[in-house]
From Swiss-Prot:
InterPro entries: SAUR_fam (IPR003676). GO terms for cellular component: plasma membrane. It is a peripheral membrane protein. The keyword Cell membrane applies. The gene is SAUR23. This is Auxin-responsive protein SAUR23. It is found in: Cell membrane. It comes from the Eukaryota. It comes from Arabidopsis thaliana.
Length: 90
């Protein structure tokens, strides 16, 4: 009985962590950034109107079209470039 209870608790924890990864908060968009190792970032939807962020999106469109290997929006640039661009948008 204790084993079943432990398994149920573990399942709840895993489902919560999986849901947290897959669903960004309202008003945000999840993007995956990096060249070889991808890291997930949450960016405000307001960034979509910014020309510098749109340039990153164009780069993504050129490389991937609408077929993103991570299942989400992937931006193929170095992580430090992404941080540099987005830090100017605050």
């Amino acid at each position: 009985m204790a084993l079943v209870r432990s398994l149920l608790v573990a399942k709840k924890i895993l489902s919560r962590s999986a849901a947290a990864v897959s669903a960004p908060p309202k008003g945000f968009l999840a993007v995956y950034v990096g060249e070889s190792q991808k890291k997930r970032y949450l960016v405000p939807l307001s960034y979509l109107n910014q020309p510098s962020f749109q340039a990153l999106l164009s780069k993504s469109e050129e490389e991937f079209g609408f077929d993103h290997p991570m299942g989400g929006l992937t931006i193929p640039c170095p992580e430090d470039t992404f941080i540099n661009v987005t830090s100017r948008l605050h």
